[in-house]
Regions:
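Substrate-binding cleft of extracellular glycoside hydrolase catalytic domains
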Residues: 80, 84-208, 215
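Structural recognition of the beta-strand scaffold that forms the well-ordered cores
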Residues: 35-39, 72-79, 111-116, 173-177, ...
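N-terminal module-boundary/linker segments of secreted carbohydrate-active enzymes
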Residues: 17-80, 85-92, 301
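Aromatic-lined carbohydrate-recognition surfaces of secreted/lumenal glycan-active proteins
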Residues: 38-40, 176-178, 202-231, 285-298
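Acidic (Asp/Glu)-rich catalytic clusters
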Residues: 28, 62-70, 97-109, 158-169, ...
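Alpha-helical scaffolding within the catalytic cores
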Residues: 22, 52-64, 96-99, 156-159, ...
Length: 302
């Protein structure tokens, strides 16, 4: 899903990965003391404000900072609509301002995580258009959508490549494409492609981004939905293509359920999900994280 309230990134380490070393080492050191907290679109908009309406080019406004006195460790941004050549993403955030937010957050010592909700390249619908189960197959080499998706991928790479620090060095980011792929709500999800097709999509995408475009400063993160995690093992593209494993797990208020009951159920289920994720991460020697979570509307102060 698209994080609507907030994203909380809890980074835990089971072993070191190979790239980029400085970011992985930082995550590892933090995991031994205090987990990192992340907030989606933190510098872009908040309660009754929007960076697009501000003259503050340093991107200093943050709801988290207003409440806690500090910026979140991790800033989440989404590249949906970059593939279409638009100036703003699917949330209405200007891509130029997003890039500046990433640079400012990095300069303050923060970490950037990027997701991507690409439109359905077959139907022209949104990422949530799962009406055609041939899309991934048609994107793969030999398919009629292959060239189109390569152009889309190059547009993603162009934006990521623009993220340079004040010394012109590439800013490292946690990169989380094709997420919640064990669910059925995205065109790359479990109801729209086979495990083999999904893994081939990941391999193809990775090859273009890393080997063809040379974007090495990426921590590749994969994150299934917690509700369909039994499908994760067969839809895992391989250790050489993944640097971090995550899971997206949200809080919901079921019909007839009190807020207190929902809160208790969420705490219990989160512990269960993280225990499962830890086991998978240890098996593959990867760091792991709670990559998306939240409660829409924040109707519970706890």
């Amino acid at each position: 899903m698209k994080p609507t309230a907030f994203a909380l990134a809890l980074i835990f380490m089971t072993a070191c990965t190979t790239k980029p070393a400085s970011l992985v080492e930082r995550l590892s050191n933090a995991a031994e003391t205090t987990p990192f907290y992340g907030h989606q679109d933190d510098l872009m908009y908040g309660h009754e404000w929007n960076s697009a309406d501000s003259l503050d080019k340093l991107m200093e406004r943050s709801d988290v900072k207003d409440v806690c006195g500090q910026y979140p460790a991790i800033l989440g941004l989404d590249l949906g609509y970059i593939e279409l050549g638009r100036s703003c993403n699917l949330d209405g955030n200007d891509f130029a301002l997003m890039a500046e937010a990433a640079r400012q957050h990095h300069a303050r010592g923060g970490i950037i995580t990027l997701s991507w909700h690409p439109d359905n390249p077959a139907t022209g619908g949104s990422a949530w258009d799962n009406s055609d189960n041939s899309v991934v197959r048609r994107i793969l080499p030999g398919g009629d959508l292959h060239d189109k998706f390569r152009v889309w991928t190059d547009r993603v790479c162009d934006w990521i490549e623009s993220l340079k620090d004040e010394n012109g060095k590439q800013i490292p980011v946690i990169w989380r494409p094709f997420h919640e792929h064990t669910g059925g709500w995205f065109w790359w999800g479990a109801t729209c492609c086979t495990p083999q097709e999904y893994n081939a999509l990941w391999h193809m995408f990775y090859n273009q981004v890393v080997n063809e475009r040379g974007l090495k400063e990426l921590v590749w993160a994969i994150s299934p939905s917690s509700s369909n995690r039994e499908l994760f093992a067969e839809r895992y593209p391989g250790d050489e293509y993944v640097d971090l494993v995550g899971v997206d797990h949200y809080a919901y208020l079921a019909p007839g359920q009190s807020q207190k009951e929902a809160d208790e159920a969420f705490v219990c289920s989160t512990r269960e999900v993280l225990a499962w994720l830890k086991e998978f991460a240890m098996l593959h020697g990867k760091p792991y994280a709670l990559t998306e979570t939240g409660l829409e509307g924040l109707n519970s102060p706890q």
